[in-house]
Amino acid sequence: MRTSDGGARLLDQIMKLALGTVQFGLDYGVTNQSGKVEESEIEDILDFAKSNGINILDTASGYGNSEQVLGGVGVDDYQIITKTTSLKHGVDEVIKGFYQSLKYLNQKSIDGLLIHDINEVNDKEFDDLFERLNELKQQGLVNKIGFSIYTPEQVNFLLENFDFDIIQLPFNVFDTRLVEGGQLQELKKKNIEIHARSVFLQGVLLDFDNLSSYFSTWRGRFDKYQEVVEKSGMSLLEYALNFALNTKGIDKVLVGVNSEQQLREIIQSAKKEGKSSAHPINDVNLLNPSLWRV
């Protein structure tokens, strides 16, 4: 069957999506009103994702019981990316944690393993840990190793000091620091696979009307942004998603959902043609959810 250029583009957009699973194990997101996702709903979400060409799941041992849930419902048809446990109890415990993740996920190997806490690079045992992760890769237990990061400075440090395969980083219409600083381009020069998370800024970019008073500092910027989105003819969801999907260099765009219906809306939005642009707000108190006082 032949596919038109337009149809191929839409398929590429959808296949660029990856499914985050933190909501499967934890209450997550400042706009999340429904809490942790029920297992029956998770099965529906995964079935719908698979039928629409989404084949990457992102999880972590720190996401509550999400690994156990995924292993229970069955994820053999997916490429799995998980993250390390804390290094504070030693390298051996991190490696044990990886094998526990394989057991929970009911997998013999996975696609990717990320260092979850980037600050651990300062630990005296980190070089040993990274060497052990490379050994897991050589043994065929994991295909790619890399990092989950928060700032451009962290990317600079990693590029100077480590050879790695994959990175997960924050990116959205408000947070384009890694484009402006050139880090995205440097990562691609080294053929490092780039996964963008926080494309909806934990839901902030989808609903400006029901935010806590913490976000009042940026109310004027939010209002101006909403005016731009309205003029574009796109919804808030379509605009934010379009921006991430169409940014050169980003290989996968992570989205998290609480229901099959939300995933349907995201996939439909990925098909929307339109032009969105960056609206940078260079304030880490907004861009880094770990700093939010909500």
Residue ranges and their predicted role:
Residues 77-90, 112-116:
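A short, structured active-site edge motif that brings together acidic residues
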Residues 51-54, 107-110, 142, 164, ...:
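A structural motif
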Residues 27-39, 83-92, 122:
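Active-site mouth loops of central-metabolism enzymes
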Residues 2-78:
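N-terminal binding-site loop/beta-alpha segment at the start of enzyme catalytic domains
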Residues 118-287, 291-293:
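Beta/alpha (TIM)-barrel catalytic core signal, keyed to glycine-rich beta->alpha loops juxtaposed to Asp/Glu
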Residues 70-79, 99-108, 158-162, 186-189:
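Acidic (Asp/Glu)-rich catalytic clusters
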Residues 103-121:
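Active-site groove signature of glycoside hydrolases
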Residues 34-48, 90-105, 150-157:
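Short, acidic/polar
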